[in-house]
Amino acid sequence: MSKTQAFRSLIALLGLIGVSIQIKQSGWGMLLYYTTLSNVIVFSFLTYLVIKEKRNGSINSNPKLLRLKGGVTMTIMITFMVYHFLLAPKVRSYDYYTIRNFLVHYIVPLSTIFDTLICDRRKIYRWFDPIIWICLPLLYFGFAIINGLLLKWPIPGTADSPFPYFFINMNKYGAQQVLINALVIALLYLLFGYILLGIKQMIGQKRQVTDNSSLNMS
């Protein structure tokens, strides 16, 4: 196992631990949070990558997977950004300073970002990738609104239940304000997506001269 594979395995394990603690302490309703779902996506995807790399070699020879990984990275990056700047200031100190909180909101997101920046091949993203990457958060937003207005599945640990987050609570702030909040977050998401795209033009692994196909040629 390479150092990159070991690092990704560690991130996946930490994500699994964080989500498991959430569910054990607060129930399966935690899966209605974007934070929890984004961590599930990360540890599932990284586990898949580790297995695939052990069989087929580095994913740096697979542009499609790298672009998909960019989307996974953005999915968890927004978890960190929204929590740290919008939600953390409202969290009580005894809820903030917990292992599960730091795992799902800080350690896993920042480690995933670091992995993408340093370990992934540079100059691989296309100009429209950030637009594609935003689809998953938008789908979650649609689901969260449907749940808050129609399904009303209870969400543990929030006074805004059945809405997961205060800034999309339509009953409290109204549709117009919620849509404005969502638009601002979406625009910031796109901005950071293009920042990631720009950074990856400059840093990361250089294109490999050989890949598995060339190594297997006789």
Regions found by a protein language model. Give the residues of each.
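Non-cytosolic membrane-interface motifs at loop->transmembrane helix junctions
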Residues: 28-36, 64-65, 92-104, 128-129
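Membrane-interface transmembrane-helix boundary segments in multi-pass integral membrane proteins
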Residues: 156-195
